[in-house]
Amino acid sequence: MKRSSGILMAVSSLPSPYGIGTLGKAAYDFADFLKDAGQSYWQMLPLGPTSYGDSPYQSFSAYAGNPYYIDPDMLAADGLLTAAECAAPDWGRDPRHVDYGKIYENRFTLLHKAYKRGWERDAEAVAAFAQDNARWLPDYALYMACKRHFGMKSWTEWPDDDLRLRKNEAVLDKYRTLLREDVQFFTYLQFLFFRQWTALRDYVHQQGIRIIGDLPIYVAMDSADVWAEPQFFQLDDDLVPKAVAGVPPDYFTADGQLWGNPLYDWDAMRDDGFGWWIRRIDGAGKLYDVIRIDHFRGFANYWAVPYGQPTAKNGRWIAGPGMDLIERLNGWFPQLEFIAEDLGYPTPEVAQLLRESGWPGMKVLEFAFDSRDSSGYLPHAYTPHCICYTGTHDNSPLALWRQEAAPEDVAHAVEYLALTEQEGFHWGIIRGGMSSVAELFVAQVQDYLGLGEGNRMNIPGTQGGNWTWRLLPGELSDALSTRIDRMTALYGRKA
């Protein structure tokens, strides 16, 4: 990567009159803002359909797009909806936070109207789209139709064992016929999502901006991916997990974090030439220009927690695929760039794998001043081949970090970066990242706005209230883009 910078902004966080960010006008406006601010990258969170808990890291599919992001206004412009139909539902009353309950209640009803009007009209284009995505789309559409049929339960709870275990093609054909209308509906939603996404991506590229996507290392148990290809996961004969993913206890979490995702059967994947991963990265490469691999350390070794344990305490480290997988990915996708999310638990094995991969790792400025464990995140310790962040979606915005951090940590930041009230605490830390030798610097949009309490995206290990933060209309001003542009140019990062 050449010296550059970008902004982290989830699609869900874009302003919208429809309760959640979409691929519509606000997304195009944000691309314009990035250009005006001299930025080179738009970093996003995963784009997949969210399930219970609303986390983009727990999706029903590793390939599908989130139907919530389909923009109603664009559907209206295409003759699939009316403006009155788009405005009628209650999309939530708080413009700062997504009300996922309201979205779930009303979005699919609205989108079903678009489906009824567009399915036959767009038949030829939908057929071409389905053919291009034949490797994953039929399983996903059938999976979602079956979930709806069985009260949105995970496939592990479906009462028909033949369907749950995918005993034969006949049982799948039975449900394809029984649930034909819903299979078509979920197919059409993906057609709409990817049509809008492709148009937005092309516009973003026209502005000289590249897109950094986020790829969760694990997929959800409640997903079409595990249901369709259970042979690639550590499951028993009844398709119950033998062990699940998590991370061990650390300074921040006494019990560790029990994620609950099924673990990969790396031997089975290796025997298949890592075809599952090649297909997954190929899908992501059609969305993004750069792919951030979440929890990179899981490629070196991963924390396996016996299934049924109440916490992640009693897990153990098991060797991952290492360079066997990474060499395959680098060889298959020479045009793609990868970022390794290598935060936490620094070990010689992870450091060696990062070096051998050739991928840049991550540095988080908020961690740099933590008196418990700075882990080499201070800018003077950087080498150029890394990505510097003010914080990630899992961190407090800088203004909130200032309130929450230990006084000695804040004092360290003030002394190290010569922070002043005149410049602004958050601007001084942004300056520290911008001026560092890191090839790429990325800040959360909340940090540029100086937002504090109530503006955090996610608190790991907690339930409820996460993934809801939204930008308000008009918050991204011309004055702000001018100030960002000036700092970006000053430190040699301007696009």
Enumerate the language-model features and the residues they cover:
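Surface-exposed amphipathic alpha-helices with a cationic face
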Residues: 35, 197-205, 330, 354-355
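Short alpha-helical segments and helix-capping/turn motifs at coil-helix boundaries
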Residues: 25-32, 195-203, 277-279, 425-429
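Trp/Phe/Arg-rich N-terminal binding region typifying the photolyase-homology
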Residues: 1-82
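Short acidic catalytic loops
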Residues: 42-46, 204, 210-216, 284-298
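Conserved, well-ordered alpha-helix/loop/beta-strand core segments that scaffold catalytic motifs
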Residues: 186-219
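Terminal-tail/helix-coil boundary detector
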Residues: 474-495
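Short, glycine/serine-rich, charged loops/turns that create anion-binding
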Residues: 49, 216, 447
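Alpha-amylase-like alpha-glycosidases and glucanotransferases acting on alpha-linked glucans and related
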Residues: 10, 54-194, 219-442, 446-453, ...
